[in-house]
Every structure is written in structure tokens, then in C-alpha cells.
């Protein structure tokens, strides 16, 4: 059944509609792959019974001629999405045993279209991390290994489980979320495609909040077209989320393979940072050449406030997190550690329930919001955020999209940066600006480094113009012809 798991989502949907195989067969093949790949620690909850039940229902609907857009396709769900009756912990001990009584809007949209749930995917605790090492359930392992090496590598974060599962063929696609790069950086580290859509394109209702003004759901998949198919289902206006945009959802897959001739693509000069590995620089130049060959006009642009993006992000995101995470007090759900009085119970619960990185960010966030520092840090960061958005607005007067690297390196070894939070935070250097400005950003696998590890290129688009990114992404995908797969060791 291995060949069923190596299909793209599009090929699997075609096979289901031509009755080459059933959803039950497809789902069973994936469940076996998931079971055999537990060494990757990609799934924190496996739901085989529910998956087969959903697959049988999908086959029945297809037989009645009522097939939805994703009918019978087995997917993995990041553990940040609430799934009714299935444990949803955001990879935190403080939510151990929490089974939501409702379904997140994004997952409800997928089930409406006939998708099948294989289980919940591991991630950094509360989506705070860039290496999937902050999970209370242990790190996720990247299915890729450096040539000639057997060190375990990070799949990136926070959507490391999603990235690892898609790359190791443990699902046809996965949901993920991106607050500062958590879809795009893991996609680059695992040779997969990930898109963070425009802020408000996908509903945040039922997604455990990290930084509410930055969080956005998106898909991870093995091809640009697969990501487009998933995003079409995930998107849509939701009155339950006040930041959800009341706009129509286009058929994103229709943009894949469209001519990009005449599109103007900007190259931000500030992204040529000191110490960028020559391989990343070379890949970027290669990407520029591919788009030129496809008929794009290349224009150098300036985003002068780029250098302030990381500091602004690491003030705004923790500030919002410190407010959002105040709801975890052991009273109504999740972990409770009793104390002598109410305050002590709060303290004991949080001391035991939150991991070190989450505590660090709550402390930073509480500090920058405190009297005397609010103006110096938080308000200043908000002003910088506005400037960053203005930089992009000026760039859009000249260009239709931007091309940059996704991450400053290929995947690194687990444990390599865990003692140095600043080195870890630098992983987001090319991605955070996109969240601060609320724009769509996509990572496409474009090559490998000297050790045979995947590298990605990032495309950034105008608000609500994901279509152009899918067209440019499929042009890069076609030119790069990235066929490399991780050699199976698990």
C-alpha cells in the first residue's frame, strides 16, 4: 500500500473519483504508515477508528454522487486546532486531557468537504518555537538526514509535526498555523510547500491563540497545487471570528500553472543579510533566474524597516501571548495542581503546566506591557509594525510580489540551538515581516544544500492576492523540479 501514501493530494482525489481505490483503502495505507513512523513523533494523537469511520462515510457519499471537494482524503491536523471530542493540547501539559466540545471553523470546513482525520500533529508548545523542541510531548524528528550523517534534525517549528508528516508521507496534507514563520520555515526544512494566507483569510475560531493579531492558519502539502486545493477548503468568512474577512474564496488551484509572463517580482535588498550562507544566496539567484526565464520582470526594492522586524515581533507576540495565556489557570479545563489557596493553585498549575519557552515569553510579554515599559517597548513596536506595513505598500506600487529565501539555513540538529533563544529566534528573520504586515507568504522547495538537505524560496504577495503566489509558486516548482525525498530510516 506504500504507493497510495506517495500520491499527491490531487492524484489521490483523481484516483478516488475514478474508483481506482476507495477512501478506506487510502486511509488504511496512511494509518499503517503513521504507525510505522512513530520514531518521528509527528502525531501526538492517532485517531484510526474515527479515520476509518470518516473514510467509510466518504465512500458512501461518493457512491451516492455527493462527493465534496476533499472527499475521502486523509489529512493530519495540527494540535492547535480544536477538534470536537478529540484531545487538543497545543502540545502543552497544561491542556493534557482537554477534549473540546466544539470544532474549529477550519477543521469543520475540511470535514464539510469530505476530508478524513488521521490524528493530531505535534508542534511547539502553544506554537512558540522554531524547532519543535518545546513540545511537552517531545521533539518531532525531521525525516531528512544529512548525507552521510545520522544526527536527528529539526523539522522546524512551530508546525514541525505537520511538516514532518507531509514530508514522510504520513498524510496527504496537513493544517498548520503561522504567527512568525511557523508554516513557511518548517516547509523549507522538510522540502514541502506551505502557505500562510492573508490575515483574516482563514477563521481563527477554535484555534488556540498565541498572538491574535499575527496568528493565521494555512496548509502544508507536497505540491503547490495540493496547497491550493487545501487552502480553498480551509478559507471562508466566519462571523464567529471578528478578524475574518468577508470576501469570496477563489478556486486557488485555478491559478496554478497560469502564465507569469509580465509579472513584476521584487527583490528586497535588505534581505541580503550579513552572514547569509552562500548556498542560500545561490539558491535565491537561481530563483530569480527561473522567474526571469518564465517571463517575469525582476525589480530591486527596498524595505528599510526590515532590520527592526524581529525585535518588534518578539515584543508584540509575547505581549499578546501573556494576555491570551492568562486563561490557563486550572479552574475550568486542563491541568490543575492544588495549592493552599486560590492564588497558590494558579501558581502551582502554571509552574507545572507551562514549559520553559512559554514561561519565557509570558515573562517578556508581561514586562513589555508593564507600567513604565509599555511606551518604551510595546507602543514603539506597534509603530515599527506600521512602518513595516508601509514599506510593503510602497513596494506594491512597483511590483506584484516579492521573492526571498525562506530561512537563513537548512535544518539544523535537534539540541543545536536550544540553549540560545536569540539564535533560535533568528530563524524567523525572513518570515516575521509578512505576519506583521498581515500579508500572504509561501515557501516552495527549490533545491538542496551541500549535505542534501532541502532549501526553500519564499514568495510574498499583496493582501488577498494568494492567486499570484500560486502562479509564481508553480512556476518555481516546475523550474526547480524538486523530486528529492528523504531516505527512509524510520
Swiss-Prot record:
<dbReference type="GO" id="GO:0030956">
    <property type="term" value="C:glutamyl-tRNA(Gln) amidotransferase complex"/>
</dbReference>
<keyword id="KW-0436">Ligase</keyword>
<dbReference type="GO" id="GO:0005524">
    <property type="term" value="F:ATP binding"/>
</dbReference>
<keyword id="KW-0067">ATP-binding</keyword>
<dbReference type="InterPro" id="IPR004412">
    <property type="entry name" value="GatA"/>
</dbReference>
<feature type="active site" description="Charge relay system">
    <location>
        <position position="158"/>
    </location>
</feature>
<comment type="similarity">
    <text>Belongs to the amidase family. GatA subfamily.</text>
</comment>
<dbReference type="InterPro" id="IPR020556">
    <property type="entry name" value="Amidase_CS"/>
</dbReference>
<keyword id="KW-0648">Protein biosynthesis</keyword>
<dbReference type="InterPro" id="IPR000120">
    <property type="entry name" value="Amidase"/>
</dbReference>
<feature type="active site" description="Charge relay system">
    <location>
        <position position="78"/>
    </location>
</feature>
<comment type="subunit">
    <text>Heterotrimer of A, B and C subunits.</text>
</comment>
<feature type="active site" description="Acyl-ester intermediate">
    <location>
        <position position="182"/>
    </location>
</feature>
<dbReference type="GO" id="GO:0050567">
    <property type="term" value="F:glutaminyl-tRNA synthase (glutamine-hydrolyzing) activity"/>
</dbReference>
<comment type="function">
    <text>Allows the formation of correctly charged Gln-tRNA(Gln) through the transamidation of misacylated Glu-tRNA(Gln) in organisms which lack glutaminyl-tRNA synthetase. The reaction takes place in the presence of glutamine and ATP through an activated gamma-phospho-Glu-tRNA(Gln).</text>
</comment>
<dbReference type="Pfam" id="PF01425">
    <property type="entry name" value="Amidase"/>
</dbReference>
<protein>
    <recommendedName>
        <fullName>Glutamyl-tRNA(Gln) amidotransferase subunit A</fullName>
        <ecNumber>6.3.5.7</ecNumber>
    </recommendedName>
</protein>
<dbReference type="GO" id="GO:0006412">
    <property type="term" value="P:translation"/>
</dbReference>
<dbReference type="InterPro" id="IPR023631">
    <property type="entry name" value="Amidase_dom"/>
</dbReference>
<dbReference type="InterPro" id="IPR036928">
    <property type="entry name" value="AS_sf"/>
</dbReference>
<keyword id="KW-0547">Nucleotide-binding</keyword>
